[in-house]
Amino acid sequence: MKYMITSKGDEKSDLLRLNMIAGFGEYDMEYDDVEPEIVISIGGDGTFLSAFHQYEERLDEIAFIGIHTGHLGFYADWRPAEANKLVKLVAKGEYQKVSYPLLKTTVKYGIGKKEATYLALNESTVKSSGGPFVVDVVINDIHFERFRGDGLCMSTPSGTTAYNKSLGGALMHPSIEAMQLTEMASINNRVYRTIGSPLVFPKHHVVSLQPVNDKDFQISVDHLSILHRDVQEIRYEVSAKKIHFARFKSFPFWRRVHDSFIED
C-alpha cells in the first residue's frame, strides 16, 4: 500500500512523522507522495485542509487520516500517543471508508476569461473588495433576495462547525448531502431587507450570487483567499466529489462537537 505523511512543520509533528515512517518500514508499505492511497496529516485541521487541497484531484483513490498534535480537530481525531497503534492498523488495511460531502464553487467572469472552479472541504466566503457588498441571490434560477451587508458564507456539513458556527449557522451532520448559506452582518431596515436566517440547500440545488454594481470580490475557499475581478456570477452547489476518511474506530460526529465546544 502506498502512503504519504504531511506535517504541520513544528518539532513535535515532524518528529512524529519520522517515527511513523520508520514504523511503516517494518511492513509492506511504500512511501509515495505522488500517488498515495493513504494520506496522513499530522498537526491540526489547518494541516489537514492543506493535505486535502494537495490531493483534491485524486480524492477517489485516497483515504485521509488526521493526527492532532495540538487541540482536537474535526478532521484530526487521532492522538500522538496512538501513532504506533495507527501504523499497525493502516498496514493491516483494517479500516472502513467514511465519506463527507464537498462544496463546488464556480466563478464566472466577463467576456474572454475562462471560468474558475474550486472545491471546498469547509466553506467558501464572498466579500466586497472594498466598497459595499451588494449581490442578487438566485436559487435554482429564481430570484430570492438582494443582499446587502459584509458578505456571505456557504459551508459544507462538516464545515458548519467552523466559520459558519461563528456566524450563527446551524451545525449539520456530514451524512447530509447539503450546503448552508449564512449572512455576514446583513443590512436590514425599512428600505433593505434580507431573509436574516441561515439557509440549507439539498443536493442538486444551485445558488447563484450575481453582482449588482461592484464586480470585484474577495473570494475564499477554505484557507485560500483571492481577489477576483470582473466577476459576473458565483455559483454554489454540492459537489459530485467526496472526501474519504479511513476510519478504524468509532468517533461519532456529535461526540466530536461535544468535545470541541462543550468539554473534552
UniProtKB/Swiss-Prot annotation:
Keywords in alphabetical order: ATP-binding, Cytoplasm, Kinase, NAD, NADP, Nucleotide-binding, Transferase
Q: Which Gene3D superfamilies match?
A: Probable inorganic polyphosphate/atp-NAD kinase, domain 1 (3.40.50.10330), Probable inorganic polyphosphate/atp-NAD kinase, domain 2 (2.60.200.30)
InterPro entries to which the protein is assigned, alphabetical: ATP-NAD_kinase_N (IPR017438), ATP-NAD_kinase_PpnK-typ_C (IPR017437), NAD/diacylglycerol_kinase_sf (IPR016064), NADK (IPR002504)
Which Pfam families has this protein been placed in?
NAD_kinase, NAD_kinase_C
Residues that hold NAD(+) according to the record: D45, G46, N122, E123, R148, D150, T161, A162, Y163, N164, K165, S166, A185
Cofactor(s) required, per the database record? a divalent metal cation
Record family assignment:
Belongs to the NAD kinase family.
Q: What does this protein do?
A: Involved in the regulation of the intracellular balance of NAD and NADP, and is a key enzyme in the biosynthesis of NADP. Catalyzes specifically the phosphorylation on 2'-hydroxyl of the adenosine moiety of NAD to yield NADP.
Name under which the protein is recorded = NAD kinase 1
